[in-house]
């Protein structure tokens, strides 16, 4: 079943009875016979279970709505120009996002470089961009690029409830990196570090909160 906070709870003969010699952990994760998975998800009408995120990563908006950032972030990353998406919304009136651009897609779609000649290494992609007399800021600060992404965001927003929809976004001047502490070695985003590194950009998204938050 799904708890009030969205966490998936399991019960059955195939579920463990507890942790070996660790009653404290057992009492934490198994309450009234229900195993608390730590996953957030939903169960459809046919009984299929869908995991949408981890409970520890769930945002709670200022109006008390639970928001699973990972699902929204992965959906927005389907936009070709987007490399990374970082959702903001915990204790906020509405959701916003930080986007980084996919330089490989810029080289292919905006400059017309043959995809077979585009290097995989991000630093080499930046060099190719510069070799073609462009800088990344030519695109991160480009109004047409912003409008193109905004159109895609508005379409994808229709897949989510109003509290989950991205109302504002910022295109960052560079991608997230391992060296800056924003990505793990397996390229998962580190939320705390991104919040710290880009705090001013995040604050700017909430200077004026005149949006429809439903």
Q: Which functions belong to the PLM regions below?
A:
Residues 1-5, 13, 93-94, 100-119:
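Conserved adenylate-forming
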Residues 1-61:
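Conserved ATP-binding/catalytic segment of the ANL
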Residues 15, 29-30, 48-77, 106-143, ...:
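Adenylate-forming
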Residues 37, 47, 73, 83-86, ...:
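Generic recognition of flexible, low-complexity loop/linker segments
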Residues 54, 90-94, 164-166:
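Short Gly/Ser/Thr- and Asp/Glu-enriched loop/turn motifs at secondary-structure junctions
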Residues 54, 60, 98-100, 172:
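Short hydrophobic/aromatic beta-strand micro-patches
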Residues 84, 125, 150-214:
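Conserved C-terminal "lid"/linker of ANL adenylate-forming enzymes
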């Amino acid at each position: 079943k799904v708890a009030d906070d969205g966490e998936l709870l399991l019960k059955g003969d195939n579920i463990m009875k507890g942790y070996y010699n660790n009653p404290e952990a057992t009492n934490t994760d198994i309450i009234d016979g229900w195993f608390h998975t730590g996953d957030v998800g939903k169960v459809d009408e046919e009984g299929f279970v869908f995991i949408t995120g981890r409970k520890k990563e769930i945002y709670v908006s200022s109006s008390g709505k639970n928001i699973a950032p990972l699902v929204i972030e992965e959906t927005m990353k389907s936009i070709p120009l987007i490399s990374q998406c970082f959702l903001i919304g915990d204790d906020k009136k509405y959701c916003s996002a930080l986007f980084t651009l996919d330089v490989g897609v810029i080289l292919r779609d905006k400059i017309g470089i043959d995809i077979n000649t585009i290097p995989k290494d991000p630093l080499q992609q930046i060099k190719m961009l510069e070799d073609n007399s462009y800088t990344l800021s030519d695109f991160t600060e480009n109004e047409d690029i912003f409008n193109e992404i905004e159109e895609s965001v508005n379409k994808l927003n229709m897949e989510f409830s109003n509290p989950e929809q991205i109302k504002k976004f910022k295109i960052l001047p560079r991608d997230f990196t391992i060296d800056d502490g924003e990505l793990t070695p397996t390229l998962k985003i580190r939320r705390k570090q991104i919040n710290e590194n880009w705090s001013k950009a995040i604050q700017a998204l909430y200077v004026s909160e005149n949006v429809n938050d439903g």
